[in-house]
Amino acid sequence: MTPHINAKIGDFYPQCLLCGDPLRVSYIAKNFLQDAKEITNVRNMLGFSGKYKGKGISLMGHGMGIASCTIYVTELIKTYQVKELLRIGTCGAISPKVGLKDIVMATGASTDSKTNRVRFLNHDLSATPDFELSLRAYQTAKRLGIDLKIGNVFSSDFFYSFETHAFGLMAQYNHLAIEMEAAGLYATAMELNAKALCLCSVSDHLITKEALSPKERIESFDNMITLALEMMS
């Protein structure tokens, strides 16, 4: 047990899917897993363990932003011995290469947060995912006929107050989208010798101002959930 997770040791499987929204975690448990069991609920940040095609897998919410995400990731790795962490979330596209409903695989994560500089003695850390997880995601997407969009993301500490004038520069440097956690997830996994990857479904396009309806968001997210579970099974 930790200050933020009240699961017992052994409740988490070595592979864990992460979502910012705990209700999305509950949705996955109820609609995609067999024998799903709630294992933690501190602060209503829900976690579950269950089976997908006979293989054990866990789910955990992590809240919004790098600070919240890294708390849960650290505790999952250090206390519960989770080895592979796959974040599945939403993002806002900033590149013409990406459209609504596309799934982005973050091969690197830049950030305006100072957390990684503090972690890395004020140097620039190359926050990258695990190669083997990335390869599995790519191969699984090919098998499922999913056109995975591959490139960098920008993990921002800001949801509302953001430097919109920088979108063009980010796109020039092959940043496909903006989200809020990948840079912290990758850095924490690197520090603690675990494997991590971030997949994001495009729910909004910050340049064209297009956005999915609530129904379309659910349908789009279901495709990413299937990809995530298939690559972990």
Swiss-Prot record:
- Looking at the keywords, is Glycosyltransferase present? yes
Q: Does the keyword Ribosomal protein apply?
A: no
> Which keywords are on file for this protein?
Glycosyltransferase, Transferase
Family annotation (InterPro entries): DeoD-type (IPR004402), Nucleoside_phosphorylase_CS (IPR018016), Nucleoside_phosphorylase_d (IPR000845), Nucleoside_phosphorylase_sf (IPR035994)
Q: Which PROSITE patterns match?
A: PNP_UDP_1 (PS01232)
GO CC terms, sorted: cytosol
Q: Where is the active site?
A: D204 (proton donor)
* Gene3D superfamilies, sorted: Nucleoside phosphorylase domain
What biological processes does GO assign it? purine nucleoside catabolic process
Q: Which domain of life is it from?
A: Bacteria
List the catalytic activities from the record.
a purine D-ribonucleoside + phosphate = a purine nucleobase + alpha-D-ribose 1-phosphate; a purine 2'-deoxy-D-ribonucleoside + phosphate = a purine nucleobase + 2-deoxy-alpha-D-ribose 1-phosphate
Q: Where is this site: Important for catalytic activity?
A: R217
Top enzyme class? transferase
Where do the annotations place a purine D-ribonucleoside binding? H4, E179, M180, E181, S203, D204
Q: Which family is annotated?
A: Belongs to the PNP/UDP phosphorylase family.
Function (record text): Catalyzes the reversible phosphorolytic breakdown of the N-glycosidic bond in the beta-(deoxy)ribonucleoside molecules, with the formation of the corresponding free purine bases and pentose-1-phosphate.
Note the HAMAP family from the entry: Pur_nucleosid_phosp
Q: What is this protein called?
A: Purine nucleoside phosphorylase DeoD-type
Q: Which gene encodes it?
A: deoD
